[in-house]
């Protein structure tokens, strides 16, 4: 997803989230401002003109973009991870594996970009070359936060298998579970997180809200929290 992407369409009431007036949208906008248009509606939901335009991109177009960035392999790796250009990612890492944890101006790594776009094969390749699953952005988001925000459950599962912290908190004290709870389409991710033996569902964000508080207000899957109801002695994560 390109950082300069802007959604000029009006939010769809059926797809947008019903946050309370006190919900901390500021952190989400500051953290993923290049991904979230006004109203916190995901750019991946619906058939926007941007989606159609990206679908029309040809292989020749992608190759041209790569050629333009060849002299800046770090920039190219970030772009390739975001665009699911697995072969390009493999080539760049074989040439210089130290670029695997390169960062953009917001401290997003290639792993963050692949995670929030759901590119599992790219995620696998990056981690195989030493990508840091604990890397944080300027606002404290880990790759797991990025995957869970957009309901990329398969990516989230893979990150957890490679020691990602299921209870990691951003600067606003948001956990991956908080972010999944705020997404109406996050059933798979919620189930994945809630069934994790190390989950701490009682953690609160900077507004003193638990993930269940957010799920009850914004989604239809708050009943899933019954999985951890009464769980006061979850195993500590070493």
Curated annotation (Swiss-Prot):
GO terms for cellular component: nucleus. ANK repeats lie at residues 77-105, 106-135, 139-168, 172-205. The modification Phosphoserine is found at residue 48. One of its GO terms (biological process) is spermatogenesis. InterPro entries: Ankyrin_rpt (IPR002110), Ankyrin_rpt-contain_sf (IPR036770), Multifunctional_regulatory (IPR050745). It is found in: Nucleus. It comes from the Eukaryota. Keywords: ANK repeat, Differentiation, Nucleus, Phosphoprotein, Repeat, Spermatogenesis. Its main location: nucleus. May have a role in spermatogenesis where it promotes autophagy in response to serum starvation, via the NF-kappaB pathway. This is Ankyrin repeat domain-containing protein 49. The gene is ANKRD49.
């Amino acid at each position: 997803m390109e950082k300069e992407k802007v959604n000029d369409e009006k939010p769809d009431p059926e797809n947008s989230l019903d946050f309370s007036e006190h919900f901390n949208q500021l952190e989400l906008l500051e953290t993923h401002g290049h991904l979230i248009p006004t109203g916190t509606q995901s750019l991946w939901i619906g058939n926007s003109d941007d989606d159609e335009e990206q679908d029309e991109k040809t292989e020749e177009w992608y190759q041209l973009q790569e050629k333009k960035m060849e002299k800046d392999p770090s920039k190219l790796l970030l772009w390739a991870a975001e665009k699911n250009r697995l072969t390009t990612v493999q080539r760049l890492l074989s040439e210089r594996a130290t670029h695997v944890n390169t960062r953009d101006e917001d401290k997003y790594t290639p792993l963050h970009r692949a995670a929030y776009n759901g590119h599992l094969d790219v995620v696998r390749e990056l981690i195989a070359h030493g990508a840091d699953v604990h890397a944080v952005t300027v606002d404290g988001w880990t790759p797991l936060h990025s995957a869970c925000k957009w309901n990329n459950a398969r990516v989230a599962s893979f990150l957890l298998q490679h020691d990602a912290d299921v209870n990691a908190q951003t600067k606003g004290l948001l956990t991956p579970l908080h972010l999944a709870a705020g997404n109406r389409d996050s059933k798979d991710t919620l189930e994945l997180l809630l069934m994790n033996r190390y989950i701490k569902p009682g953690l609160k964000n900077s507004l003193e809200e638990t993930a269940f508080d957010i799920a009850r207000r914004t989604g239809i899957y708050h009943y899933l929290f019954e999985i951890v109801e009464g769980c006061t002695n979850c195993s500590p994560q070493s």
